Amino acid sequence: MAQGEKIIGIDLGTTNSVVAIMEGSEPKVIPNPEGNRLTPSVVAFTDKQETIVGEPARRQAVTNPKRTVYSAKRFMGRRHNEVQSEEKMVPYGITGGPGDYVKIQVGDSEYTPQEISAKVLRKLKESAESYLGHKVNKAVITVPAYFNDAQRQATKDAGQIAGLEVARIINEPTAAALAYGLDKKKDESIIVFDLGGGTFDVSVLEVADSGDEEQESRVFQVVSTSGDTHLGGDDFDEALINYVASEFQKDNGIDLRNDAMALQRLQEACEKAKKELSTLPETDINLPFITMDASGPKHLTMKITRSKFEELIDALVERCRGPVLQALKDAGMDPKDIDEVVLVGGSTRVPKVREVVKSIFGKDPHQGVNPDEVVAVGAAIQGSVLAGDRNDVLLLDVTPLTLGIETEGGVMTALVERNTTIPAEKKNVFSTAADNQTAVTVRVFQGERKMANANRLLAEFNLEDIPAAPRGVPQIEVKFDIDQNGILSVSAKELKTGKEANVEIKDSGALSDSDIEQMQKDAEANAEEDKRQFELVEARNKVNQQVYQLEKLMGENDDKLSDDDKAPMNAAIEKVKKAAEGDDLAEIKAASDELEAASQAFSKVLYEKTDAAGEAGADAAGAAGATAGGGDDDDAIDAEFEVKE
């Protein structure tokens, strides 16, 4: 690793993602090019084959719903028959046979969820490189504690496609505990309650000093973990969307869920209402011109109270209790044994969620961490440990689900029980089920069910050339090896001959090494083009806002101006509009500069022609000056977005 090079920490979230580093002993959350610390996990593909990532992608979702991909994390490492509820929640297409790994349909193209996530990771990587002033090659990336082997491997693949060596995959609650407990001096038992956009995790940890006088360090030991990878803030949004859409359908006979653009507007409005109801007793959803029928345009106006919202999400929030109680049971603890409850994830801001947490533990949760950023900060701390920058932290994580093989009768025989500390190696000796059997098939499963086929098949492989013998005589040793990332390798060896077969569970994410290498090359080859397209979109947004402001100014003062007064401005506006329709960035910027010059001249004419020179002239100069300066790009685009909505 290059001198001074950092291992960055990344929280790859369902809704938003965050990147952080350690500067000395202090964590630093790195802002993106838009100046925000949270980057929406959104990727959009325009009709002009442009790829947009993050906030700019989120802003254009209303007008481009079927080509805007969000919540891709819900589909990482998942087969089509595992995402039937999730695919109904998104406007873009989900493809693949029932047992196939999911692909995302955008126009005529298909993308794996790993490729979509890689575009988000690359943006975070570039943000870190811009901040640090040098290339970044390594990252610690977090995943939900309850992610299975396939989902972990898919996350690692996404990092590789983005051009990152994934130094470690760590669980989100564990990362949050690192950030929470690093500077604490006392020993304590904590529980991390992590409810994000698409997943729910809960982990019980013991945080203590190592007791080593020569090398004092803080030990973070995960005792147990549990969760639900089908539960999060997206589900809260969906509950509100369905309620509002059903009420609108009762009144108007139109189901907005069948109109992709209307549904996208409704989704954004409901997400906004959900956030507002965390601090307000009620809020309004106002969506003018949401649709139309033969009688004309229809408008959606509805008041939502916090009590109604809590009624809608009550069953979802109650689902949080089960994993919490299971984690406590696995840890051999009662709620009273927990010293602190640490809330992580934006969805924990919902008052109903906090009420449930308080009802379980009998006390208010700890509120001293930023729930949106704490996971990335913890990942950055682990990155600094792996980089050798600090040696005062020891992290002991666990595997969230039982791992085993199918044995006679279809039984699931466990080799690695859930909540086993990792890295771990476990082995057991098995034999044949029939006389003179010369080959066995090892089928590897993950899950808690007693019958193997009720669990998730990770892989299967054959061990052949076993010496013929009566059943029960051959000795076959099966070994499971789980690395620090929670990713599994399995081997089987016939002990008499030493004949061995093994498999690293890499196929679980449906990407081969050659797939990843090709996707990485494609991403690198298109990096400059992606950057150019991003700049092109930003330039178009800027000139569109310029035109809007100036046309508004001309309209407000139309009675004071002659056609000759307006001619130079109209010519400049037409020129910049034409330039914005094309793909020449230099031409757009040149036309924008000409428009700024024309706006300055126009403000002078308007000033001279206005009777109330002081007041009107100042207004005109202020408006034109704001336009000439370009304004704040974020504010400009937000305003445009709100008008569309």
Curated annotation (Swiss-Prot):
Keyword field: ATP-binding, Chaperone, Nucleotide-binding, Phosphoprotein, Stress response
Residues recorded as bearing Phosphothreonine in the entry: T199
GO biological process, one term: protein refolding
Residue span of region Disordered: 509-530, 615-645
Bias (Acidic residues) ranges: 631-645
Residue spans of biased composition, Basic and acidic residues class: 518-530
GO MF annotation terms: ATP binding; ATP hydrolysis activity; ATP-dependent protein folding chaperone; heat shock protein binding; protein folding chaperone; unfolded protein binding
Pfam family, one: HSP70
Stated family: Belongs to the heat shock protein 70 family.
Record-linked HAMAP family: DnaK (MF_00332)
Entry function: Acts as a chaperone.
Name of the protein in question: Chaperone protein DnaK
